[in-house]
């Protein structure tokens, strides 16, 4: 159910630089030129928005900034020409209630929603039910319930993931992201001596670890 390259009814919703890179890889690997790129932001002073915009600039991609810090900011979309417009949507993060709410509004009946890679969050997302509810705040809870209602009403398809993780699950459709198109002709940086620390939500890795490695990971958490 992934997007066919000849279809031009595509919207992209992202909030972070990494999500932007995944979206660019999707566009290039599928040779898609007709789309609308929405950069979602919750404030006027958003560092993530600034970096994401710089990344899009490197690839000469036009984008529209959408600032929806409050729940009521989404309601004008319901009466706009964007409502029910797109048959296909790339959504940066399965767990982002704001992205899901926007996708549920601008998506058409039976719209195909493909979730882009958001690191270890993708592993958690694949395990979750399609209509995930975020309870970290009242606003996000309402966003989740509202988007879940629209997704069900419109019978949207929410089981597509574009990820670099190897994961076999009959409930979802997974397309491999190897970043091969994003990396083409990019300048390489020579390796330098030093220590590189990559932060991650280690709980998401438990699914891939055997008992011995899980214990080692737990001990690492305790002493770090």
Walk through the language-model features, giving the residues of each:
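Short boundary motifs at domain starts and secondary-structure transition points
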Residues: 1-5, 27-29, 78-81, 183-191
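Nucleotide-activated donor-dependent transferases that construct or modify glycoconjugates
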Residues: 4-16, 197-200
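Active-site and donor-binding regions of nucleotide-sugar-utilizing enzymes
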Residues: 11-150
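A nucleotide-sugar donor-handling region in carbohydrate enzymes
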Residues: 117-118, 123-126, 130-204
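Extended hydrophobic/Leu-rich segments
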Residues: 39, 82, 86-88, 112, ...
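Low-complexity, charge- and small-residue-enriched intrinsically disordered regions
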Residues: 4-6, 85, 152-153
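Nucleotide donor/acceptor-binding cores
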Residues: 7-8, 87, 193
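Conserved catalytic-core segment of nucleotide-activated headgroup transferases in glycan assembly
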Residues: 194-224
